[in-house]
Amino acid sequence: MVSSKSTSLDALKSLRRLLILIILFILTNVCCENAGWAVENNTEERPNILFLFADDWGRHASVLSKIDGAGGINDVVQTPNFDKVASRGVLFRNAHVSAPSCTPCRSALLTGRHFWQTGTGSILRGAVYDSSIPSFPPLLREQGYCVGYSHKVWSPGTPANSPFTQDESFGKNGGRINQFSQTVTKLISKGTPRETAKLAILDEVRGNFRDMLNSCKDNAPFCYWFGPTNVHRKWIKGSGKDLWGIDPDSLQGKMPAFLPDVPEVRQDLADYFGEIAAWDAAVGVLLDELEKAKLTDNTLVVISGDHGAPGFPHGKCNLYSFGTGVCLSVTGPGVVGGRVVDDMVSLIDLAPTFLETARIKPPESMTGRSLWPLLHSKKSGFIDPTRDCVFTGRERHVESARADFTPYPQRAIRTHDHVLIMNFRPDRWPLGDPYRLEDGPEPTQQELETNTRVTLPDEDAGPTKAWLVQSRKEESWKQLFNKVYGKRMPIELFDLTQDPYEMHNLAGERAHAEVVKKLMNRLLSELYKTKDPRLKNDGEFYETPPMAGPLKEKSPGWKNQKRKP
């Protein structure tokens, strides 16, 4: 006869085993969801990483016309190769940079931190790379990856293209991609057929990538950063139509509210789109070479840009969506493709993503969050409810933008419905002092198109800037000019559901006070949590040399940057 005590003990043991099984089941599913790649792909062979990163390429791709709806300027863009990656991989609809300025954006991307967490690398002119902060290329190198790059990684700044070393640069076949429209136009003028001239440049791109692949020994996985600068101004006027058949008139009626719908600006935008088409052609060459080398199936391909359009209102150096919004698509092993993800993501999320791809645990210093849970998900649209905002900001761009060599400090929080921008020094001109606009002599057309520093120096020189400056006194354009270049309120709030072009500041309206309070609290909480120097001692770190003030000696560039054998 079995005692009741024995029966109770057996029941307890069974219950314990059941609880253990339940806990193991929960932990296994949580790990799979959060670890993404590493759990689902526990193989010996680590994937390669091909990172294609364009200078000054904002949120402009033909595939966006399809997912956002026709009627905008993306109707005119030609990006068949990016579209191909987006269709077979994951396209992120709401991707933003940490800072809409080359060097701080890249500092943030490399380290997986907000730009204000990157020390002396958090400005443009005068930046010094802080190698004490962990970044993904050295971590990959230390774990056996063959790392290399072509063209631009991190600059302007000292040492240039950190944290890569000079012997990890691959460019001996040529770098004419960086002056695409200039080079092709010159070759055509000497009798070279247009398509032949294009192919000559793209062959250089192909050759540099081949050299990088051939440098990798013992079947080591590679990480290659391709960073051409052709999308950055200056480009040849009229080249969008001449080289790519992009008719400026096709933009008529499609321009956003902050861009004048006039021939000069339409042509300028068409030329910008021409350089994007050239960039996309280079992407196609690299994807083709990857396929020929039979490496496609084990290579994570990530394509993006470092901020919005240069030399246009609301673009580069602005915290509006035209300035911080970028294209981002990912495909490769472990990625559940054919999806569009609406979660808010930041390019600081790429560093931990790359490390997890390589089976490396991201260091605790990284603020960004790996994208692998999103890449591994089978869902589309909104996936992770905690990814409901991104944080952006800026400090110094051009050192002489203001006569006293001070920055224009901004921080912002962006959600699906709103963007709130804090302008810490509203007494300053956001895009630089209006040199020679109030006390002459007026800048000439040529100066405005070619010399960024002649006036409003935090916006690149170009035909659009020239047109707006020269039209600023006309009644029909005065209001737009003042909105774009004039001093701004301490707080800006835009309702993106009603005002997608961010033209009407609602911060001062009582009806929106609760939204301002809520977003302000979230923004300040993040800034304090991540120890933003702007909040300490009235921003002393950014207001004093070397982060402010005139520049000193010329950058020593590659000094002492050879990799040790």
Predicted segments with their positions:
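Short arginine-rich
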Residues: 528-531
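A contiguous binding-surface segment within folded domains or other stable secondary-structure elements
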Residues: 495
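Bacterial N-terminal signal peptides that target proteins for export
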Residues: 2-21, 31-32
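Formylglycine-dependent sulfatase
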Residues: 26, 32-492, 500-521, 535, ...
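A glycine-rich phosphate-binding loop feature that marks nucleotide/adenosyl-phosphate handling sites
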Residues: 539-543
